[in-house]
């Protein structure tokens, strides 16, 4: 119902516990006296507001006898339009049983479900599938790094516009749009599985030494698999469009709906759930990788998960996420523009904005014409920009490790892809979630100010920097590999898989099937010079190998059998995996403990009306300088440590087969330490520059609160009069 006093929503205006105190004075007097307390604002108001107020003759409340003047009407309508509270439902459908969802806790639950779904896909399933996608579609790590960065490119391009226009719009419905785009992106990402045909194992070729072998032809279908790169990029772009409203408008909506001291706890919980998503994604993806990629062919194939040619069903998780994401569209669209009680909560908040950015016009940012000025205003806030650069440096390494940690563990410690992904998820996800929750809890528990939250983040980053040298503490040496790091019993040259012992075998470089013999790994049984095999044994064993001198004997209940090589990689002798996992787990905790405090600091150091835009700028810069180049830099860095590339029948270089473990460890620790130092520098500089607003500066924020309080008083008074 709309009147001269504004918009009334009597059913959903929360009754104030101090209503009698607020009704003891005229509402108009409350507003005018609050506005006139600031000399600068007083000079800018119409003449009617500058007239001295006559003393009240009666303390009894009375309704205004005349319509408010133009200035008061504008201020009142502005405040009411900002806090349109309503019931939970769709159009005229508002069941009473669903109104329990119409609370900050109810919204947080739905927010967490969407954040979990987004985390499952973007930071869980995508990361755990990278190694499989590399092999299936013959891509380099730099190309799969581009796939990971495509999400951030989309986020970066849209964040400013979504955050600016969404701040004035219906935020929950923006999140319904986010759920739709996340589901669509997950669906598109799975499409290459259905159009790329059946996975070819290459079993038509003999894996043993054959002196007469037919030459293989180069088919265009093999080399064209990498063209599916563009489909993966499209899926990531759609996922980025869905993630943009979630972490800008969703975070601002949570901050709107709860008191200041609870904001960090709610935001920390939401961010922790966004990290729980990757945990589920890693576990789910790890289990799905134990299913053969072509599910219908799984029972008929004779290879096992230990076979290097094995590829898991990476695509199933994306289809499940598509269904779950779309199931959240309707629940989000049922939320009102603001939750009941938001206006009263906002009336009790105090500004902590950086002094140079505290005196923004209350009506600023309501028009598209204000966008350039709003952007310039935030870019001139030195504290805000330092915090943004700090998070960008941190995001570079966190995104890089989230993408390539399973690959690092797989190659450093000689594990299977699925087990390495499970271990990576077991370290990354619980550590990140625990860090987010601890950070938010400590900020809320001790009610830290803006400056104290920045100091807390600086401390946690320092601890993480100290422990980042774990890659040097727990690195593993390179395992012996014939023709790469080890010669063929003193013959042949390093860097050449062909030696005198296998020169007549006509081995195929495109057929990678490692075997282990005498503690040395060989590219395939053919390159080991093996001419015979026993297929019924698991694992498959080979004998009459010209490149292997010493035989290995195995005894079973039925027979004693001598062989020279067995299928699979050699067992690693490095026992530093537990040390690495424990120390890296602590590094992750302290790294993510700074996440919530920095977000809270950003929300506090800018003007109240520019928080969504501030988050949009943060995520744009964070992705431009952090999460977009992060996986690409890590991909090129890891590729630079490759010592044996896969080359197909057409002579095209594919995925890397063998890495230099020592060089990889040193390169990764160099990136980590550099980024940590940059993070701490900008964080410390923000602390040095920050100037909390003096008490007089807070008046501009309290003037808005006075108007909101006045509106609440009038609504409560009208309700009493109508009920009477």
Curated annotation (Swiss-Prot):
Alphabetized SUPFAM superfamilies for the sequence: Kazal-type serine protease inhibitors, MFS general substrate transporter
Cytoplasmic side: 1-105, 167-172, 255-274, 337-377, 444-447, 604-612, 691-724
Membrane topology, as annotated: Multi-pass membrane protein
GO molecular function: organic anion transmembrane transporter activity; sodium-independent organic anion transmembrane transporter activity
Cysteines joined through disulfide linkages: 501-530, 507-526, 516-547
Compositionally biased spans, kind Polar residues: 25-38
Keyword Aminoacyl-tRNA synthetase (UniProt): no
Residue intervals on the Extracellular side: 127-145, 198-224, 296-311, 400-419, 472-580, 639-672
Location(s) in or outside the cell: Basolateral cell membrane
InterPro entries linked to this entry: Kazal_dom, Kazal_dom_sf, MFS_dom, MFS_trans_sf, OATP
Keyword line: Cell membrane, Developmental protein, Differentiation, Disulfide bond, Ion transport, Membrane, Phosphoprotein, Spermatogenesis, Transmembrane, Transmembrane helix, Transport
Function, in words: Mediates the transport of organic anions such as steroids (estrone 3-sulfate, chenodeoxycholate, glycocholate) and thyroid hormones (3,3',5-triiodo-L-thyronine (T3), L-thyroxine (T4)), in the kidney. Capable of transporting cAMP and pharmacological substances such as digoxin, ouabain and methotrexate. Transport is independent of sodium, chloride ion, and ATP. Transport activity is stimulated by an acidic extracellular environment due to increased substrate affinity to the transporter. The driving force for this transport activity is currently not known.
Protein name: Solute carrier organic anion transporter family member 4C1
Species this protein is from: Pongo abelii
Gene coding for it: SLCO4C1
């Amino acid at each position: 119902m709309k009147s001269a006093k504004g918009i009334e929503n009597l059913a959903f205006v929360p009754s104030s516990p101090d209503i009698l105190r607020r009704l003891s004075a005229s509402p108009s007097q409350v507003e005018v006296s609050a506005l006139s307390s600031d000399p600068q604002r007083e000079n800018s108001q119409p003449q009617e507001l500058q007239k001295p107020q006559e003393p009240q003759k009666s303390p009894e409340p009375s309704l205004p006898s005349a319509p408010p003047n133009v200035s008061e009407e504008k201020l009142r309508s502005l405040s009411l339009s900002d806090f349109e509270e309503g019931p939970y439902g769709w159009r005229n459908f508002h069941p009473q049983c669903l109104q329990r969802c119409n609370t900050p806790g109810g919204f947080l639950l739905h927010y967490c479900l969407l954040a979990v779904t987004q985390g499952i896909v973007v930071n869980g399933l995508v990361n755990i599938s990278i190694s499989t996608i590399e092999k299936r579609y013959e891509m380099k790590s730099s190309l799969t790094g581009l796939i990971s960065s495509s999400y951030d490119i989309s986020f970066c391009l849209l964040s400013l516009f979504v955050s600016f226009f969404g701040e004035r719009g219906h935020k929950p419905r923006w999140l319904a749009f986010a759920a739709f785009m996340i589901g669509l992106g997950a669906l598109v990402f799975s499409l290459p599985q259905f159009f790329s045909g059946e996975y070819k194992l290459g079993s038509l070729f003999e894996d043993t030494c054959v002196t007469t072998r037919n030459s293989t032809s180069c088919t265009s279908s093999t080399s064209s698999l990498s063209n599916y790169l563009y489909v993966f990029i499209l899926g990531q772009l759609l996922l980025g469009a869905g993630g943009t409203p979630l972490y800008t408008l969703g975070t601002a909506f949570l901050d709107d709906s709860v008191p200041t001291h609870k904001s960090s706890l709610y935001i920390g919980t939401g961010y922790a759930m966004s990290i729980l998503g990757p945990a589920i994604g890693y576990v789910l993806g790890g289990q799905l990788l134990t299913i053969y990629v072509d599910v219908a062919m799984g029972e008929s194939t004779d290879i096992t998960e230990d076979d290097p040619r094995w590829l898991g069903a990476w695509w199933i998780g994306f289809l499940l996420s598509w269904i779950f994401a779309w199931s959240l569209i309707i629940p989000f669209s049922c939320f009102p523009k603001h939750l009941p009680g938001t206006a009263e909560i906002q009336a009790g908040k105090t500004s902590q904005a950086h002094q140079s950015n505290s005196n923004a016009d209350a009506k600023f940012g309501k028009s598209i014409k204000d966008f350039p000025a709003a952007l310039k205003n935030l870019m001139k806030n030195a504290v805000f920009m330092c915090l943004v650069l700090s998070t960008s440096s941190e995001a570079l390494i966190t995104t890089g490790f989230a993408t390539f940690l399973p690959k690092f563990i797989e190659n450093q410690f000689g594990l299977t892809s699925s087990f390495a992904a499970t271990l990576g998820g077991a370290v990354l996800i619980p550590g990140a979630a625990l860090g987010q929750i601890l950070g938010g809890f400590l900020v809320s528990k001790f009610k830290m100010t803006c400056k104290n939250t920045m100091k807390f983040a600086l401390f946690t980053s320092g601890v993480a920097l100290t422990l980042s040298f774990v890659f040097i503490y727990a690195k593993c040496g390179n395992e012996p590999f014939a023709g790469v790091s080890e010669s063929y019993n003193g013959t042949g040259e390093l860097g050449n898989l062909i030696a005198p012992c296998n020169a007549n075998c006509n081995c195929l470089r495109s057929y990678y099937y490692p075997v282990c013999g005498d503690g040395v790994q060989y590219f395939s049984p053919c390159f080991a010079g093996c001419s015979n095999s026993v297929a019924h044994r698991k694992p498959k064993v080979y004998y009459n190998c010209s490149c292997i001198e010493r035989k290995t004997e195995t005894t079973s209940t039925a027979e004693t059998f001598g062989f020279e090589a067995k299928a699979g990689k050699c067992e690693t002798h490095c026992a530093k995996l537990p040390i690495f996992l424990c120390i890296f787990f602590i590094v992750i905790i302290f790294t993510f403990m700074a996440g919530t405090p920095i977000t809270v600091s950003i929300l506090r150091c800018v003007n109240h009306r520019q928080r969504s835009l501030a988050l949009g700028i943060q995520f744009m810069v964070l992705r431009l300088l952090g999460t977009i180049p992060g996986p690409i830099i890590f991909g090129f860095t890891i590729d630079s440590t490759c010592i044996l590339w896969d080359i197909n029948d057409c002579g095209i270089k594919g995925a890397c087969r063998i890495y230099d473990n020592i060089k990889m460890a040193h390169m990764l620790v160099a990136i980590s330490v550099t980024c940590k130092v940059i993070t701490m520098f900008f964080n410390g500089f923000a602390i040095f520059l920050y100037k909390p607003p003096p008490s007089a500066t807070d008046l501009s924020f309290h003037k808005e609160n006075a108007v909101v309080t006045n509106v609440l008083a009038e609504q409560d008074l009208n309700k009493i009069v109508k009920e009477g």
